[in-house]
Amino acid sequence: MATERYNPRDAEPRWQQKWNEDKVFETDNADPREKYYVLEMFPYPSGRIHMGHVRNYAMGDVVARYKRARGYNVLHPMGWDAFGMPAENAAMERGVHPASWTYQNIGSMKAQLKAMGLSLDWSREFATCDVEYYQHQQHLFLDFLEKGLVYRKQSKVNWDPVDNTVLANEQVIDGRGWRSGALVEQRELTQWFFKITDFSQDLLDALDTLDQWPEKVRLMQKNWIGRSEGLTIRWEIVPETAPAGESEVTVYTTRPDTLFGASFLAIAADHPLAKDAAAKNPEIEAFCDECRRAGTSLAALETAEKKGMDTGIRVRHPLDPSWELPVYIANFVLMDYGTGAIFGCPSGDQRDLDFARKYGLPVVAVVMPRDGDAASFSVGDTAYDGDGVMINSRFLDGKTTEEAFNIVADRLSAASLGNAPQGERKVNFRLRDWGISRQRYWGCPIPVIHCDDCGVVPVPKADLPVKLPDDVTFDQPGNPLDRHPTWRHVSCPNCGKDARRETDTMDTFVDSSWYFTRFTAPWEDKPTDPEAANRWLPVDQYIGGIEHAILHLLYSRFFTRAMRETGHVAATEPFKGLFTQGMVVHETYSRGAGASREWVAPADIRIDELDGKRRAFLLTNNEEVSIGSIEKMSKSKKNVVDPDDIIASYGADTARFFVLSDSPPERDVIWSEAGVEGAHRFTQRLWRLISEAADALSAVAPAPATDGEALSISQAAHKTLKAVQNDYDKLWFNKAVARIYELVNALAAPMTKVAAGEGDATYRAAVRDAAEILIQLVSPMTPHLAEECWAALGNEGLLARASWPQYDETLVIENSVVLPVQINGKKRAELTISRDADQNTVTDAVLDLDAVKNALNGQAPKKIIVVPQRIVNIVV
């Protein structure tokens, strides 16, 4: 066969068309084979895919193609997480309707994904903004409402007065809205909530069953759920300092053992006592307003300067009524955790210590390490928050912290304040119910109606879907649904009187909390086909970024439980296996400095090696630019590489192979032109080896050698097959690539020999067997090239439909051993030899090694010590 360079621009569209025509990747739910459901987190249709998408979807595609070849009935679908603020921003900034913007972007990104050659079942595609999707989400909402898993209540929210919308805690940065920069206000709004807290303990306990999830993700969820065992303690307010009608403060603590180290109580700015104090004191009122504007995310609380104001209120210590403590309003206490009040033990908590030092409050060490000295132990600038032995704690001295916890809990549970116990054991969770109300247009409408006579009335399921109106305007901030002249006005389903639709839409995290279930039967006229859902769920392998470790993954776990409670699925967990891949990162380039710094795109510079250093220059005028740090690809720093450009220049297989080959999949991959060119050279080399030998190989049937000259070829191929199979099972893509490179090197000479017409039929059959193994090993990563090579060998049918090869057990047995060779105790060489070689054979082979000959330099060894299958030592 005449050898030509492999042309991906010709081959890739041709094979994609063939796969599409043959519907190779469409999945039949009725197929009786064992199922395997692989899913990558579906993308937001921003308009273009980026290299992070390429890596994510290439990984999923390797798994899908490999499992399909192994005989599984594979489900590998794709859709679009299509609701959200960017579409509304585009509507405001460009005057384009969110639906038009979204569907146009979907069209562009779908074409890009198809160009990657992904083995996706596009027949199951949907976007979450499709009415056909969100009508079923409304159905689920109503089912959850009937089951008591949805409720409505007044809730304090972060309100952006410019964007006129609610912000999540994480979207408040230094008291300002993340997008508008406006000072955030605290408002009381009536919001819809999902009762995720009904499942707090179950969500926590079940983490132990998710043994195919990264430990880091499980730990993050465990901490987010935040189970703690503690004590609620009622503190009596000193009557002379008590506001009217108030007599006590309830505190929740996980460390009642440290009560004798208490020096203050701290309450949230929204605590009733704080509100009372603020009403009487303008300074306290201003401080409370400042606290409310600050971010309430965990990160914001941990990094903010600790501030407080003394309310003038005093409380009596629960273990010593003669001991009075001040009550402060503090900016690090939240009303929605515990009781909105804490006691501060400065010696045992760094935050409390910083606060106490700032405001001159006592610091008494009450816990020391077990090996500490009570006479000398003290707390300086660092609190001791560990377990240990009690000191300076009266009747608790000498007890362990665990013993002290129980003694205090028992004593306060037996004591009374008024008509109730002063203390009560309690399990608390950090997890809060999920507020899903958003004051936006581009989201799933909440299917309820508000009637003055009947109250909140669910939309009858027969009247679903509640569709978004198309005729909306974005010429002013706020929710267009509130301003629509007709959409919100309806008749009450109960009494028929005039009523109003709910104008809030659902948080977009709702859309992505059950999409994996819908993929199992997206044609159904109800949310799920339980039979299909129960067959396919849980997802066997879910792949996506670790930035979704908490919210999306936790919400999906809740949703699956809620859908089980309402009869839609039998599964408890949505994802059996989870893999969190690293990012694609790139060097940054810039010109200028400070405020005048201008970022430069990689495509606009060239890199030269001058005086042993890498230097960057603009292509246009040779101006030198600065080479910065390696960072996540981002539009803001222009360190992005367009996948379209890479595919146009090198082909999709090169892009896929590079992002899989250059680093472990859980780590970041550094994009480099040299790395891409190396991947491209590999594809060309593989094609050249196969195509040059194709005529000779197509004339023989593949058969591994059992002895003779070709045995080593078959051993190399079958050992690599076994190893790469294990690598694919464990998602070790970069290790698979390294082994494939080694096999290509091992086959280069035999393939060249066959291409030259040398070797007998047995030899050629062994080479063909090895070549086919090589092609199949690389096919999940470079599927177009593999199809081209497969066809070149004369194979009929698509490789995408072919079964995975089976390795020959007799060929993968390790019959050799590598022995370190020492001369006078210093390692000089290694000897690879048959495991059952006798001592004389080992000795002769060692003396024949070039490294040994050079080291001996003609000397005769005094002694050669052979430790069988371990080591050889030559004494000179």
UniProtKB/Swiss-Prot annotation:
It comes from the Bacteria. Its EC number is 6.1.1.4. It is found in: Cytoplasm. This is Leucine--tRNA ligase 2. It comes from Rhizobium johnstonii (strain DSM 114642 / LMG 32736 / 3841) (Rhizobium leguminosarum bv. viciae). GO terms for cellular component: cytosol. GO terms for biological process: leucyl-tRNA aminoacylation. It catalyses: tRNA(Leu) + L-leucine + ATP = L-leucyl-tRNA(Leu) + AMP + diphosphate. Its main location: cytoplasm. Belongs to the class-I aminoacyl-tRNA synthetase family. InterPro entries: aa-tRNA-synth_I_CS, aa-tRNA-synth_Ia, Leu-tRNA-ligase, Leu_tRNA-synth_edit, M/V/L/I-tRNA-synth_anticd-bd, Methionyl/Leucyl_tRNA_Synth, Rossmann-like_a/b/a_fold, tRNAsynth_Ia_anticodon-bd. A motif ('KMSKS' region) lies at residues 632-636. NCBIfam families: leuS_bact. Keywords: Aminoacyl-tRNA synthetase, ATP-binding, Cytoplasm, Ligase, Nucleotide-binding, Protein biosynthesis. GO terms for molecular function: aminoacyl-tRNA deacylase activity; ATP binding; leucine-tRNA ligase activity. The keyword Aminoacyl-tRNA synthetase applies. The keyword Nucleotide-binding applies. Pfam families: Anticodon_1, tRNA-synt_1, tRNA-synt_1_2, tRNA-synt_1g. A motif ('HIGH' region) lies at residues 43-53. ATP binds at K635.
